[in-house]
Swiss-Prot record:
SUPFAM superfamilies: CBS-domain pair. The keyword NADP does not apply. InterPro entries: CBS_dom (IPR000644), CBS_dom_sf (IPR046342), Diverse_CBS-Domain (IPR051257). The keyword Repeat applies. Signal peptide: none annotated. Residues 9-66, 84-141 form the CBS domain. Gene3D superfamilies: CBS-domain. This is CBS domain-containing protein DDB_G0289609.
């Protein structure tokens, strides 16, 4: 069974701009119940990725105040571009899913931005997507009566 990334990826994509402040990124992650946001320029080109972990590390700094509102205020002072991972690991939409799994395992990332043949961002594939596929493949099929 050969499954391609394009068959598994999420096409409803949330992205964030380079100039967005960290507080807005945090709110976007929380509001959409997601763990990573591709960072794009004004033309929609992928420039980086920011994760909930990146933001947790930024907000858990001993240099920030204890009060959450004060922490958010400090995050308003910094742009996504200041902490994003540049040149994130990506995969093409026509790649086999097994390649995505290997790439995630080797690079220790929880999700990959998916690019088309022209290098445009068109989706995301995550560990959860891979686990859902694994469950579907391994789950016994009930006998037909």
């Amino acid at each position: 069974m050969k499954v391609l990334v394009k068959q598994l990826m999420s096409k409803s994509l949330f992205t964030i701009n380079l100039d967005t402040t960290l507080d807005v990124a945090l709110k976007s992650l929380n509001a959409n119940s997601i763990h990573r946001l591709p960072v794009v320029d004004n033309d929609g080109n992928l420039k980086g990725i920011i994760t909930d972990r990146d933001l947790r590390l930024a907000t858990d700094s001993p240099f920030l105040p204890e009060n959450n509102e004060d922490r958010l205020e400090k995050l308003r002072l910094h742009k996504v571009s200041s902490i994003m991972k540049q040149n994130p690991v990506t995969i093409e939409d026509f790649s086999p899913v097994v390649e995505a799994a290997k790439l995630m395992r080797v690079t220790n990332v929880g999700g990959l931005p998916v690019l088309d043949k022209k290098g445009r961002l068109i989706g995301m594939v995550t560990r959860s997507d891979l686990l859902d596929l694994l469950i579907k493949v391994l789950e016994p099929v009930p006998p037909q009566s």
